[in-house]
């Protein structure tokens, strides 16, 4: 997998936009050459050896729970794991021990959760290019998809999420919150960091959401958390 999320300021320091992408910035209604035609004829399996890079946000886990019928705790026993991401404990998809492939990859090397796959997988080979904590574009990453003859498709259709405006608003809210948490960690003790991480896991991942009311309930929990922590 590629970068997923990259920052303008980081890229200006380390690498240029043209080095990792086609150099263009895309919005939801733009056409982009990413359509793989369901990966037909592709001999490369891109869902192997991703390590801990498929980090899951609360909406990813909400959708996985609905699709698999498993609770967050049950998913932790099977397909996902917890790891540290810049000081925050966040879930990611686990790799299979023997094949090093995604734990949701079937015996036929096809995705078993395609209809409710995580956001990083939905975007691929697109990534988000963050101008700051609250504004992003999409970029088409270089050398990520091995399929030949990709065709053009509208970004919103490629991502395939209903009500993408609400989804994008949520993505920005969660991203901004995590960045605030990461900045706050510098002034906390080890015990306080542990408490904050457990709070976030319980509040946004473990606690269930009412069907079709994810975005509303998430926003309520987020606002309460920001007020409580004075962020």
For every predicted segment, state its role.
Residues 8-73, 77-231:
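Short loop/turn segments that flank or connect secondary-structure elements
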Residues 1-7:
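Short, small-residue-biased leader/transition segments that mark boundaries at the very start
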């Amino acid at each position: 997998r590629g970068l997923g999320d990259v920052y303008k300021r980081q890229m200006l320091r380390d690498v240029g936009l043209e080095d990792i992408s086609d150099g263009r910035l895309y919005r939801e209604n733009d056409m982009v050459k990413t359509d793989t035609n369901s990966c037909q004829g592709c001999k490369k399996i891109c869902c192997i050896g991703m390590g801990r890079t498929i980090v899951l946000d609360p909406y990813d886990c909400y959708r996985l729970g609905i699709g698999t019928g498993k609770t967050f705790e049950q998913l932790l026993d099977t397909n996902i794991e917890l790891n540290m991401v810049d000081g925050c404990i966040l879930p990611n998809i686990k790799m299979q021990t023997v094949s090093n492939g995604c734990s949701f990859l079937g015996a036929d090397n096809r995705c078993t959760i395609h209809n409710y796959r995580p956001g990083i997988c939905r975007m691929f080979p697109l990534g988000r290019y963050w101008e700051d904590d609250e504004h992003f574009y999409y970029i088409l990453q270089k050398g990520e998809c091995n399929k030949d003859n990709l065709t053009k498709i509208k970004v919103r259709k490629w991502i395939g999420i209903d009500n993408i405006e609400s989804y994008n608003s949520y993505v920005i809210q969660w991203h901004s919150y995590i960045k605030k948490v990461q900045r706050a960690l510098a002034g906390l003790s080890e015990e306080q960091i542990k408490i904050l991480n457990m709070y976030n896991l319980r509040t946004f991942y473990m606690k269930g959401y009412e069907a079709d009311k994810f975005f509303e309930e998430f926003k309520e929990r987020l606002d309460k958390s920001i007020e409580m922590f004075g962020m």
